[in-house]
Design a protein with these regions (language model features):
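Generic N-terminal targeting/processing segments that precede catalytic cores or assembly contacts
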Residues: 1-391
Length: 391
């Protein structure tokens, strides 16, 4: 299962096409729209969210609520397009008096993209590199999420830090499975702890008062996974590498850890590795801890997969940093776009989708099949074999 997506931030729409989707998968339009709404939520979002009310339109690959084995096309309309029809026209001549973007923002793709593509207008770069494009990615991920849910896998996320405000958890790589959707989604910053939520909101307010932006970290958790997804034989097989690539593909992500992550460099081996035990009640091998975050040797262990992701502050500042005007080559203030103060809660929702795609691919590779019935049968057989190995 893979997807491609197209569209500009202020174009008419964003489009995603998901290929290699097995037939017989039930897809919920309302669930995709719910994920799109979660992406738009979160304390610290900017004015664009008051304009857009994202909903998905599916134009191929689904009939009567089930996939039919052909590519699924999903579209999300940009309501703000009506304010940009002249400046973002697909055809015709450039309008007279068009204001070009010539003061690239530090920390954004503006300057390097303009140099790479030989353009004197950073608008061509920022329209595509804008995080607005993640609406299409979240819509596409709805297919992967439905696929995983049908196989008993759940993917969720929560924010554990914004600026200096941190949700201090006890044994997070085990206890994270106890957080409910209600705990997470009722928080304005998608943090399952009320005290930490208040502290995070205060950090966002501090950045807003200073006309600045602020970043943070979040965790993505996947439960219900079978052991053995991914591989150890080649570099491309390793699920750790695939997940890292997928998470780093999201705008503004600067760090990814699995389980204890960088903390392992400070610990002894006996403090890091998870002892293996036999669970005779469930007929399976398991571990007494989950410091590895559900991944060993590039494969899933069957324990919750836990990734922690760091997001940098958004580079569009209301108190701009210095830059160089590409026309005059003189010092100038960087350009200002309508932007968020903090988008960490929204980025976590995008990351859920990217993790879902990687895991969906891993299931398809391991259990094959052109339809859900075959995939489920193969998965059932694999689970039965695993039980016999632990008896």
């Amino acid at each position: 299962m893979r997807y491609v997506f197209a569209g500009e931030s202020h174009g008419s729409c964003l489009t995603a096409i998901v290929e290699d989707v097995p037939a017989g998968l039930r897809v919920s339009e309302s669930q995709i729209n719910s994920d799109l709404a979660r992406r738009q939520s979160g304390y610290g979002r900017g004015g664009r969210q008051s304009i857009e009310r994202d909903t998905v339109q599916v134009t191929s690959g689904i009939r009567f609520g089930k996939t039919i084995g052909s590519p699924v096309t999903l579209t999300v309309r940009n309501r703000d397009w009506e304010n940009w029809t002249d400046r973002m026209a697909v055809f015709g001549e450039e309008p007279e008096g068009l204001v070009r973007e010539v003061t690239p923002r530090p920390g954004h793709a503006d300057l390097v993209g303009a140099l790479k593509t030989n353009t004197d207008d950073c608008r061509n770069i920022l329209e595509r590199s804008s995080a607005r494009s993640t609406a299409a990615r979240v819509a596409a991920a709805g297919i992967a999420r439905e696929f995983l849910a049908d196989l008993g896998v759940e993917v969720f996320s929560y924010v554990n830090r914004i600026g200096e405000a941190e949700f201090r958890e006890e044994s997070p790589f085990v206890n994270c499975v106890n957080y409910t959707p209600l705990d997470i989604e009722t928080s304005e910053v998608r943090c399952p702890n009320a005290q930490a939520t208040r502290a995070m909101i205060a950090e966002i307010e501090r950045a807003k008062a200073e006309r600045d932006t602020i970043g943070g970290t979040f965790r993505v958790v996947a439960t219900g996974l079978v052991p053995g997804l991914g591989g150890y034989a080649t570099a491309d097989d390793r699920l750790t590498a695939r997940l890292g690539q997928a998470l780093f593909s999201i705008q503004a992500m600067k760090g990814v850890e699995f389980g204890m992550g960088f903390e392992v460099a400070r610990r002894l081996g006996s403090e890091v590795h998870d002892p293996i035990v036999l669970d005779r009640e469930r007929d399976c091998f398991t571990r007494t801890s989950n410091n590895a975050g559900g991944l060993e040797g590039g494969m899933t262990t069957g324990l919750p997969l836990v990734a922690t992701v760091a997001m940098k502050p958004i580079p569009t500042l209301m108190r701009p940093l210095a830059t160089v005007n590409m026309d005059t080559l003189e010092v100038a203030d960087a350009s200002k776009e309508r932007s968020d103060v903090c988008a960490v809660p929204a980025a976590a929702v995008v990351a859920e989708g990217e993790v879902a795609f990687v895991l969906a691919n891993a299931y398809q590779e391991m259990f094959g099949g052109s339809c859900m019935a075959d995939i489920k049968a193969n998965l059932k057989s694999y689970k039965a074999r695993l039980r016999t190995m632990s008896r």
